[in-house]
Amino acid sequence: ELKLLKITSKTHLHVSIVRPSLVYGPNVKGNLQLMLSGIKKGWFPPLPETKNRRSMIHVDDLVRALLLVADDSRANGEIYIATDGKLHSSREIYEAMCGVLAKSVPQWSVPKFLFDIAASMSSRIQYKVSKLLGDECYSSEKLQSIGFKAQRSLKEMNETCF
């Protein structure tokens, strides 16, 4: 990224870099798709509220951010992080997905210590548990400083959001 910005700083090209946080939206892939599928089929465990913090952005807002950066001369040569500006816990994401699927949210959850025990069994499991229950939060203040404001939110999700 830095080499690209250095090379293009000597040209008249408008180059900016946008690093998206966890992206959700139609046809979501990766861990969010796996979680959604597991909740739908009934095998994904109810997550505990660990107060972890995760940044996310809806694909529509990411497109808006990309268009803003491409069109704003202040963005030339800059690196931005795209988020919806809110922090979400994994439990909130789990509950939102239950809502999308019209499934009731269980009143219980798998205790965190069971995830910790599983994580101690192998580095692969530890990595998965960390991705599921760990923090992954970023600031989009720099993007907001050029006028970006997310229009979609996790709490407003419906079946078209995944």
Stretches found by the model and what they are:
Residues 88, 127-162:
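C-terminal amphipathic/interface module of NAD(P)-dependent oxidoreductases
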Residues 68-127, 159-162:
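Mid/C-terminal beta-alpha module of Rossmann-like enzyme folds, strongest
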Residues 34-59, 104-137:
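Alpha-helical membrane-targeting segments
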Residues 28-34, 48-70, 77-78:
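Substrate-positioning beta->alpha
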Residues 13-34:
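Flexible, glycine-rich beta-alpha linker
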Residues 1-16:
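Active-site Tyr-X1-5-Lys
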Residues 47-52, 80-87, 98-102, 132, ...:
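Glycine-rich Rossmann NAD(P)(H)-binding loop
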